[in-house]
Amino acid sequence: MSASAGGSHQPSQSRAIPTRTVAISDAAQLPQDYCTTPGGTLFSTTPGGTRIIYDRKFLLDRRNSPMAQTPPCHLPNIPGVTSPGALIEDSKVEVNNLNNLNNHDRKHAVGDEAQFEMDI
């Protein structure tokens, strides 16, 4: 049977999560861990459950700041990703090698030779 002795069951009162909007004046005030909503709003949650919603205008202004334009330190050297100059040099060498191979193939092409033999 039921643990309640015939008493009526009342639903608990729901409460909204307390929120506050903070206008940030310095990028150092942003926490390391933050969340996003499906709409793209950034927010973080305090240990007490309060959501801190970050102002979109401030974040968009910070997009063009010198710190946002500076790559992180200690990145690995990945040609074409972290070092664009290396990719350009490598692609020039590769194009020259392909041109040399194509010229070499044209000089030695005698006829239509089969690539392999196959017994049928």
UniProtKB/Swiss-Prot annotation:
Pfam families for this protein: eIF_4EBP (PF05456)
Motif placement: TOS motif: 116-120
Motif extent (YXXXXLphi motif): 54-60
Main localisation: cytoplasm
Tissue: Enriched in brain.
Modified residues (Phosphothreonine): 37, 46, 70
Effect seen on changing residue 37 to A: Impaired hyperphosphorylation
Superkingdom, taxonomy of origin: Eukaryota
Any one GO MF annotation of this record: eukaryotic initiation factor 4E binding
PTM entry text: Phosphorylation at Thr-37, Thr-46, Ser-65, Thr-70 and Ser-83 is mediated by MTOR and corresponds to the hyperphosphorylated form: it abolishes binding to EIF4E by inducing folding of intrinsically disordered regions. First phosphorylated at Thr-37 and Thr-46 by MTOR, inducing folding of region encompassing residues from Pro-18 to Arg-62 of into a four-stranded beta-domain that sequesters the helical YXXXXLPhi motif into a partly buried beta-strand, blocking accessibility to EIF4E. Deamidated at Asn-99 and Asn-102 to aspartate (Asp) in brain. Deamidation promotes interaction with RPTOR, subsequent phosphorylation by mTORC1 and increased translation, leading to impair kinetics of excitatory synaptic transmission. Deamidation takes place during postnatal development, when the PI3K-Akt-mTOR signaling is reduced, suggesting it acts as a compensatory mechanism to promote translation despite attenuated PI3K-Akt-mTOR signaling in neuron development.
Record key words, sorted: Cytoplasm, Nucleus, Phosphoprotein, Protein synthesis inhibitor, Translation regulation
Protein's GO biological process: insulin receptor signaling pathway; memory; modulation of chemical synaptic transmission; negative regulation of translational initiation; regulation of synaptic plasticity; regulation of translational initiation; social behavior; TOR signaling
GO cellular component: neuronal ribonucleoprotein granule; nucleus; postsynapse
Sites of Deamidated asparagine modification: 99, 102
Annotated knockout phenotype: Mice develop normally and are fertile. They however show defects in synaptic plasticity, impaired spatial learning and memory and conditioned fear-associative memory deficits. Mice show behavior defects and autistic-like phenotype, characterized by social interaction deficits, altered communication and repetitive/stereotyped behaviors: they show an increased ratio of excitatory to inhibitory synaptic inputs possibly due to increased translation of neuroligin family proteins. Mice lacking both Eif4ebp1 and Eif4ebp2 display increased their sensitivity to diet-induced obesity.
Subcellular location: Cytoplasm; Nucleus
Phosphoserine: residues carrying this PTM: 65, 83
Family affiliation: Belongs to the eIF4E-binding protein family.
Its biological purpose: Repressor of translation initiation involved in synaptic plasticity, learning and memory formation. Regulates EIF4E activity by preventing its assembly into the eIF4F complex: hypophosphorylated form of EIF4EBP2 competes with EIF4G1/EIF4G3 and strongly binds to EIF4E, leading to repress translation. In contrast, hyperphosphorylated form dissociates from EIF4E, allowing interaction between EIF4G1/EIF4G3 and EIF4E, leading to initiation of translation.
Comment block on domains: The TOS motif mediates interaction with RPTOR, leading to promote phosphorylation by mTORC1 complex.
Assembly behavior: Hypophosphorylated EIF4EBP2 interacts with EIF4E; phosphorylation of EIF4EBP2 by mTORC1 causes dissociation of the complex allowing EIF4G1/EIF4G3 to bind and consequent initiation of translation. Interacts (via TOS motif) with RPTOR; promoting phosphorylation by mTORC1. Interacts with PCMT1; required to prevent isoaspartate accumulation and convert isoaspartate to Asp.
Protein name from the UniProt record: Eukaryotic translation initiation factor 4E-binding protein 2
Protein species of origin: Mus musculus (Mouse)
Lineage: Eukaryota, Metazoa, Chordata, Craniata, Vertebrata
Gene name per UniProt: Eif4ebp2
